[in-house]
Amino acid sequence: MNFEWNERKNEINLDKHGFDFTDAYRVFDLPMVVDLNERDDYGEDRWIGTGMLDGRVVVVVYTEPDELTIRIISLRKALSHERKRYEQYFKN
C-alpha cells in the first residue's frame, strides 16, 4: 500500500493537532473502526478510521484514489465519544 498526502496540509495538521502524516501508515497496521464520511459531498469517498498510534486512540481521515493508494487528509487525537466507541468495539 502506498501513502500520499499534501505536504502543506501535513504542516497545518502538525501545527493544529500535533500529528505528522508520515506516521499515519502505522494506524493502518492495527485494527480500526472505519466509517464512510457522509457529512459532506467531497466528490470522492472519504473514510474515517479510528485506531491506535503510540498508545493513543486517533482518527485518520483518508481517501483511496486507487486500489494501491491511501491519501491522508487528517490525523488527530480521537474525541471522547470516538475513543469510547473504539474501546467498546474492541472490548472483547
Feature map (PLM): residue ranges:
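Ribonuclease/tRNase effector modules and their secretory precursors
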Residues: 1-92
